[in-house]
Design a protein with these regions (language model features):
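Short glycine- and acidic-rich boundary segments immediately preceding or forming the N-terminal edge
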Residues: 1-36
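Generic beta-sheet signal
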Residues: 46-50, 96, 254
Length: 283
């Protein structure tokens, strides 16, 4: 069973009731009017932004981020440590912000075999050809991870029209989800970003004018996690969030990729990545 939009809302409501110091905001909506939420904790002026995978329609990266955020909240509230780090001290200096679902409509479409696509149901069924096992697009059949305004014209689009995957969209930032993430980044100006992915275990970094910082941080993350470093080919960055962010903000955009498992494996996955997530939030 996948982690769906209702489960996200229930989790957010639980956090809201338990931790009154958390800031929860809807930063935008998908085409089916499902909100894209951000959750923030901390008192500092600077922030680190974590995002769930744009193509994770099983909710694995969403669950990992929410578990991490809730652990931070408990430690902050009770003045506890995580991996020998005193969380309250860290969060007096900066904010940690998460966007636990970046493609809420895609998540629902995948989980419901297209039934929850609302007015886009017909489009979605045609685009998927009734096979939703590979669905990672939004309600208009656009793959969000290819829709960002970074060398968009050079971005390869496997599909020419709405599809379960591979269609970059009619023009750059054409999608509501893309626009919401862009506007949010401009509003909070994070010092760097970390996207969780579900495409095998590795660490990668995109940067345009901060190569030395990027290389140093990536090596530290590798030494802590034991994960290999993946070199991103220039063509792989076209249309991507990481390519857009690093170019627009002259700051690193990291990707921590996990193996694609079921949500039932959450604990073992989370335990493996907690120290890496914590370190990446305080550097």
């Amino acid at each position: 069973m996948c982690f769906n939009y209702n489960a996200l809302q229930e989790h957010i409501e639980k956090i809201k009731e338990s931790f009154d110091f958390v800031s929860i905001t809807s930063i935008g909506k998908g085409w089916c009017k499902r909100s894209i939420y951000s959750l923030s904790i901390g008192e500092g002026e600077t922030s680190v932004l974590f995002l769930a995978d744009f193509s994770d329609t099983a909710g694995i990266t969403s669950e990992i981020l929410l578990t991490f955020f809730e652990r931070l909240c408990v430690a902050y509230k009770n003045d506890l440590k995580i991996s020998a780090v005193k969380i309250r001290s860290i969060l007096r200096e900066q904010k940690i912000v998460i966007v636990p679902i970046t493609n809420p409509d895609g998540l629902e479409i995948s989980c419901s075999d297209g039934e929850n696509a609302l007015c886009y149901k017909g489009l979605v069924q045609r685009a998927a050809d009734n096979n939703f096992s590979e669905w990672i697009s939004n309600a208009r059949g656009v793959e969000i991870g290819k829709n960002f305004p970074y060398r968009f014209s050079d971005t390869k689009s496997i599909m020419k029209n709405s599809s379960a995957f591979g269609y970059k969209g009619p023009f750059e930032a054409s999608e509501l989800e893309t626009q919401a993430i862009i506007s949010f980044c401009k509003a909070i100006n994070p010092k760097y970003t970390i996207t969780l992915s579900c495409s095998g275990e590795y660490i990668s970094c995109q940067c345009s004018k901060c190569a030395s910082d990027c290389a140093m941080m990536t090596q530290v993350f590798k030494s802590v996690s034991g994960l290999p470093i993946k070199r991103i080919k220039p063509c792989e960055a076209y249309g991507s969030f990481g390519g857009w962010f690093s170019k627009s903000f002259s700051a690193p955009s990291f990707c921590f990729s996990v193996s694609k498992r079921s949500v039932a494996d959450l604990k073992s996955l989370y335990d493996k990545y907690e120290e890496l997530l914590l370190l990446s939030s305080i550097m």
